[in-house]
Amino acid sequence: ELADKIAAADGYVMVSPEYNHSMSPALAHLLNHFGSSLFSYKPSAIVTYSAGQWGGVRAAVGMRSFLSELGCLPVSAMIHIPKAHEVLAEDGHFLEPVDAEKWTSYFARTFTQLTWWASAAQNQRNAIDPHKLAPAFKKDPRKEIPPQETPNNSSLSFRTQ
């Protein structure tokens, strides 16, 4: 059932706390479990938060490369929420005296990019099935081995002193 929901989506909002300078292990496990076949050729937005002053920015850096490897390309604008416990209530509403208008404007840049890219990617997927263009993309990338070149020992030179 979850796989069907993931496959049906045109884009994703990936939300993670910063956990030891990385994304949540639960999110990483979920992404690894379903792999690139469900997330590929669809955009994502990265939202991170932390109790500290950096808002999960270190987790976001790792998430960007992780999502890119899945073919789930993140939009350039990211959302970082420092001291999340002072900004958001458990139900997701803004706490007082937080300036909700400023935060909403901050979120809008990311979500506008995600909406635009999701629409563009959906139109392109409907026009051309990307898996027909690149069937190798459905394979597990870890099983792809690059061609091995045998070095010609005679062309190697070392400086000795």
Where are these regions (language model features)?
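Helix-loop-strand module that forms the ligand-binding subsite of alpha/beta enzymes
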Residues: 1-74
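Glycine-rich phosphate/pyrophosphate-binding loop and the adjoining helix
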Residues: 75-161
